C-alpha cells in the first residue's frame, strides 16, 4: 500500500511533527508512505517538496492579503482565519499518481485551495483527512472557543469586524466548502475523541465518515532518563524543582501563559521552584513570573528537547483550546507528570491524579493547586511510571499505524464499492 501524506510543512508546527511521526510509523509497519510538503525543512528522502515556483509564496501572500482586506486592514486575527482561496494542484505529480491513498493533514496557508481539494476528490483516489484542529469542519477558524455556529452553518463570525453578519465571509466560505464536498466522501480522522465529537456535530460534515486516532510518538527518542544528568547537560542547577511550559510561540494567547503567570503568583512560597519556558518569545514573559524563570527560547534539536523534559519535575500546558497536544504526549513519554485544563483532548491524555492533574477550565487557582500537588506528592514515582505506561499502551507507533492501516483499507474498499 502506498500512502501520500500531504501537509504544509514537515517540521514546523504540531501538525507537521505529528504527520512526520505517522509517516515513520507507517513505514515501520509495512506501508510505503511519503510526505508531500510546501516547506521542506528536513533532509528526509521520504519527504518531497512541491516543485519550486514563485507561485508557492504568492499563494500564501494572496490569501493573507485578502484576509487583511476583509479584516479592514487590521492584523488582529490575521493568522486565525484561513480561506483556502489559493493553493497548488498536486494531482499531476508522480507522487500523487503512484499513491493508493491520499492522506491530507494540515494543508492551510496556501498549500491547498478548496479547488485543489475538489480536484483531489475527483481524481478517484480514496482520501483520508486527519483533523489537527476544527478547521475542516468550520468555515474560517481553527479554534471555536465556544462558538457553536458550525453545527448549523457559519455566520456572524466572531473573528470578523463587528462580529460579522448573516451573510458574511464565513457564510460564503461555508457554502464553498459545501460545494467542494457535494457528492464526495472523505474519511475524517480526529486526533482526539473530543474533536471527533465536534466534527460529528458539524453541519458541514454530515454523512461523512468520522473516527478518532491519536498521534503516534517514537518512544525510542522520547523516553525517561536520569534527571540529574539531563540537568548537567543543560547547565541547570541540580537542586531546584523545575516547572516546564512549552509552546512554539509562548505569547500565543491560546496557550494560556496568563494563567501560568497568575498560578505562579499563587505559588510564590515555593522558593525552590524555577519555571523553564521553552519556545519563541520566552524572554518577553519571563519578567512577569513571580517565581524564578529561565527562558530557553525556541529549540529545534530533538535531543535537547528530550533533555529538557527529562530535567523537569512537572509540565504545565494551560491551553484554552487543544486537540491532543504533542507536548503532553512527549512529556509523559519522558515520565514527566503533566498539568492542564479540562479542555479538548487534554483529559484524554492526563488521567487525573494518576499521571498528572486536570485543572478546572480557566481556573488559575486550580492550575496552581495541580502544580503544587505534583511537586509535593509522596507518590511522584507512581505518577511518572503511569505516564510511561499510558504512552506505551495508547500512543506507540505500532498501535497507531495499525489503526490507520485499517482506515486506509476501509477508504479503498469504499471507493472501489462506489465505482
Annotated model-derived regions:
Residues 352-353, 357-364, 373-378:
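Conserved acidic donor-binding segment of nucleotide-sugar-dependent glycosyltransferases
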Residues 138-143, 164-212, 217-227:
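A short, active-site helix/loop in glycosyltransferases that binds the activated sugar's phosphate group
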Residues 337-340, 350:
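Short hydrophobic beta-strand element within catalytic cores of glycosyltransferases
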Amino acid at each position: 500500500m502506498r500512502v501520500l501524506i500531504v501537509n504544509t510543512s514537515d517540521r514546523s508546527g504540531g501538525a507537521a511533527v505529528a504527520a512526520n511521526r505517522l509517516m515513520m510509523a507507517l513505514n515501520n509497519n509495512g506501508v510505503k508512505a511519503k510526505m508531500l510538503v510546501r516547506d521542506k525543512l528536513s533532509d528526509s528522502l521520504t519527504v518531497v517538496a512541491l516543485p519550486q515556483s514563485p507561485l508557492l509564496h504568492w499563494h500564501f501572500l494572496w490569501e493573507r492579503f485578502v484576509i487583511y482586506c476583509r479584516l479592514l486592514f487590521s492584523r488582529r486575527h490575521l493568522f486565525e482565519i484561513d480561506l483556502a482561496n489559493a493553493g497548488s494542484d498536486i494531482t499531476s505529480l508522480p507522487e500523487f499518481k503512484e499513491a493508493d491513498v491520499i492522506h491530507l493533514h494540515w494543508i492551510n496557508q496556501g498549500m491547498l485551495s478548496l479547488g485543489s481539494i475538489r480536484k483531489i476528490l475527483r481524481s478517484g483516489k480514496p482520501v483520508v483527512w486527519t483533523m489537527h484542529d476544527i478547521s475542516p469542519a468550520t468555515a474560517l477558524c481553527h479554534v471555536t472557543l465556544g462558538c457553536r455556529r458550525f453545527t448549523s452553518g457559519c455566520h456572524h463570525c466572531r473573528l470578523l469586524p463587528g462580529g460579522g453578519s448573516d451573510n458574511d465571509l464565513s457564510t460564503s466560505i461555508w457554502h464553498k466548502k459545501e460545494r467542494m464536498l457535494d457528492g464526495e466522501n472523505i474519511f475524517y480522522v480526529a486526533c482526539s475523541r473530543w474533536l471527533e465529537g465536534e466534527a460529528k456535530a458539524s453541519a458541514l460534515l454530515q454523512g461523512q465518515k468520522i473516527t478518532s486516532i491519536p498521534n503516534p510518538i517514537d518512544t525510542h527518542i522520547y523516553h525517561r532518563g536520569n534527571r540529574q544528568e539531563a540537568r548537567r547537560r543543560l547547565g541547570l542547577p541540580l537542586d531546584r524543582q523545575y516547572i516546564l511550559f512549552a509552546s512554539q510561540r509562548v505569547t500565543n494567547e491560546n496557550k494560556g501563559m496568563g494563567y501560568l503567570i497568575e498560578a505562579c503568583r499563587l505559588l510564590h512560597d515555593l522558593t525552590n521552584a524555577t519555571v523553564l519556558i521553552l519556545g519563541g518569545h520566552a524572554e518577553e514573559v519571563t519578567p512577569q513570573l513571580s517565581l524564578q524563570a529561565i527562558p530557553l527560547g525556541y529549540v529545534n534539536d530533538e535531543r535537547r528537547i528530550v533533555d529538557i523534559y527529562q530535567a523537569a519535575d512537572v509540565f504545565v500546558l494551560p491551553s484554552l483550546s487543544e486537540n491532543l497536544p504533542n507536548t503532553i504526549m512527549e512529556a509523559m513519554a519522558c515520565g514527566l507528570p503533566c498539568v492542564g485544563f479540562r479542555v479538548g483532548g487534554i483529559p484524554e491524555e492526563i488521567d487525573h491524579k494518576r499521571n498528572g492533574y486536570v485543572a478546572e477550565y480557566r481556573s488559575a487557582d486550580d492550575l496552581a493547586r495541580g502544580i503544587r500537588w505534583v511537586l509535593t506528592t509522596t507518590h511522584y514515582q507512581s505518577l511518572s511510571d503511569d505516564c510511561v505506561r499510558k504512552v506505551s499502551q495508547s500512543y506507540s507507533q505500532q498501535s497507531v499505524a495499525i489503526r490507520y492501516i485499517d482506515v486506509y483499507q476501509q477508504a479503498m474498499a469504499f471507493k472501489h464499492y462506489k465505482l
